Amino acid sequence: MKTIKSLFLLSLLIVNLLISSTYGSSIRVSIVGGEEAEVIEKPRTFGNKRELKLEYSQIYPKKQLNQENINFMSARDTFVDNLMSKMSITEKIGQMTQLDITTLTSPNTITINETTLAYYAKTYYIGSYLNSPVSGGLAGDIHHINSSVWLDMINTIQTIVIEGSPNKIPMIYGLDSVHGANYVHKATLFPHNTGLAATFNIEHATTAAQITSKDTVAVGIPWVFAPVLGIGVQPLWSRIYETFGEDPYVASMMGAAAVRGFQGGNNSFDGPINAPSAVCTAKHYFGYSDPTSGKDRTAAWIPERMLRRYFLPSFAEAITGAGAGTIMINSGEVNGVPMHTSYKYLTEVLRGELQFEGVAVTDWQDIEKLVYFHHTAGSAEEAILQALDAGIDMSMVPLDLSFPIILAEMVAAGTVPESRLDLSVRRILNLKYALGLFSNPYPNPNAAIVDTIGQVQDREAAAATAEESITLLQNKNNILPLNTNTIKNVLLTGPSADSIRNLNGGWSVHWQGAYEDSEFPFGTSILTGLREITNDTADFNIQYTIGHEIGVPTNQTSIDEAVELAQSSDVVVVVIGELPEAETPGDIYDLSMDPNEVLLLQQLVDTGKPVVLILVEARPRILPPDLVYSCAAVLMAYLPGSEGGKPIANILMGNVNPSGRLPLTYPGTTGDIGVPYYHKYSENGVTTPLFQFGDGLSYTTFNYTNLACSNCKPISGQSGNYTGVLGQSYTFTVTVTNNGNVQGKDSVLLYLSDLWAQVTPEVKMLRGFQKVDLMPAKSQQISFTLNAYEFSFIGVDNKITLESGQFIIMVGNQQLGLYLQ
């Protein structure tokens, strides 16, 4: 890095003489997809810096509509106009109301109370329902909901809703399908999003979303509450595992890939979304993922520049780039303003800058929470008014009729005009039209799609995703893969070594995760997977003991048993981490690993036997660095899902070559919290992460050579330095070679470093990634094209800004310099 910078400094005078500046002119810049946009160059008072400003409408220009789009929109608008002209105030408010399924079921049952449902349908015309009857726990002795029960339930609700509606308006049902259709029995469960991100392979995000949509739509539910697009920079936060990690670019690319997978590459604004696709929900818009306290739904203090630099891009890519049909609003507050009351962000930014045309739904009880939780409203009426003024469309009430009753009174009193209802109702009806609910509201229990739930090829896709996610962080003396010629006895221990429940984490069968492994009809634990692929014979013997159970007092007897078995083992594999959790119940006060798990690990390391540490965890729990470095190997498994056990076993035995990379910074101490890899230059050396973002080893070695810019102008006499014109796209190529003896996949990461800017730049930012699969001694040239937006930052005026200057492009150990004028 220092060499490149020095060459830049030496060549600046020559470059400035060679390249002229223009001021106040209109120029064209390269943007997403190779398109161009016209921007106005802002003059500078002095010096030779050039500065350009971009808007999201230029970065993501609206697509050209074809005749099919035009016909669809015309037919939809005519239909919705006619329907709305016949709707009463009560019907319109009903469309804006969403209730939980448990408002329709009796305690400890999943049976729909049809009398209650008919009352809601005929009196309040409720337009949406959500959730699983067993989300919060067992309903009597019922653990899960299978496809036939779901289909019967949805058909019952839909039939009674349509019968009760004067205009035969169908309801829309939504479900948290977070890592697969996790509330549908037998559905395939994938790694949670941090694991997906660790693959650095957008194909896995697309495939996971496609299968999730298919399995959700198969039971009659066309609305999926996913993906989470928050940036995972607060490791204390209970929902960090639902994010795609700490990097805005990874979250943007993986999130957009998921949106396209969920919706079949379509959006609901200019065309239909047909089965097996569902409409998805970009959530939680936005700033939710970095609560200052680390506790769920608590206050976030994020300056406007940081919001726009790090937290908004993933939503822009998903909404404006990929066409997400709905958004769910951040339950918390940002800079003292609950997002549900923010006209700036829900209307000016979301509807204005991001051009969002879809439905904005609240999260759980969030309008009511403006009164008793946020204290911005002194009454339910004031809370509803604040939320409507801000721009919500649908209220996830979800447990009573307060919203429709009070809103009807407010409209009757003239406090809320009917025209405000019409804005939201039109969006909701447009969505229902796009999903085909008016023409085909009832799911078919005999449809072929129902039989595909949990099919073998889906579970194989989940296993393949887990294989590419698992990240080898440490491998002393190449202890992995385990050599069966020299290793005959293995001890497998730890609380997550034989637990499918722990592999899945939260949002699995129930909101807080499964109670027991028997709730999963498919899947393998690590122990089962290891025994299956090794046959567990006398030639390779696997011993198992739990060692310790998470959440119970220290049981030295269990630890002693593990230590005793370790004495007769050649290698010890210990699997530690966390129990399933989600949202507020998952709040913690200390990021440190459970001390009893640390004690188990310490005593196993003290035996002197090689210890392979496997981490199965929702958050990067802090471990004593010296203890971790004493382990022979470290594998990060994240929450790999039901199918995760066998991929982990295959990596241990060398049947699969690990290729995951960390999508977040793994802290070594509490002082590392809140400092991501893209920190400022002034923060260099202030943290000591246990492992860095992008870390990940392989059983082979990859070499990078010949990094070059194919359409830049080389600087004469300055090898590796180039010049270019601000606002253009540039293509960089690098050759990747497998120098080892085994086939392997490699995630090739391209970073951009802005050396000087009007706003202090980050040391580096990821601007491209690709996955390659190479046989030994084979090479492949990788190409990355960076458009103008990817050289931008958020300027002193909080606008997207391009500025002439010096940049470093980095891929592995390769670097080049680029001066843009």
Swiss-Prot record:
Residues 1-24 form the signal peptide. Belongs to the glycosyl hydrolase 3 family. Glycans are attached at N113, N146, N266, N535, N555, N703, N721. GO terms for cellular component: lysosome. Keywords: Glycoprotein, Glycosidase, Hydrolase, Lysosome, Signal. Gene3D superfamilies: Glycoside hydrolase family 3 C-terminal domain, Glycoside hydrolase, family 3, N-terminal domain, Immunoglobulins. It comes from the Eukaryota. Its EC number is 3.2.1.21. SMART domains: Fn3_like (SM01217). This is Lysosomal beta glucosidase. GO terms for biological process: glucan catabolic process. Glycosylated. The polyoligosaccharides are of the high-mannose type and are highly substituted with both phosphate and sulfate moieties. Residues 25-69 form a propeptide. PANTHER family: LYSOSOMAL BETA GLUCOSIDASE, PERIPLASMIC BETA-GLUCOSIDASE-RELATED. It holds the Pfam family Glyco_hydro_3_C. It catalyses: Hydrolysis of terminal, non-reducing beta-D-glucosyl residues with release of beta-D-glucose. It is found in: Lysosome. GO terms for molecular function: beta-glucosidase activity. Its main location: other. Transmembrane segments: none annotated. The active site is at D363.
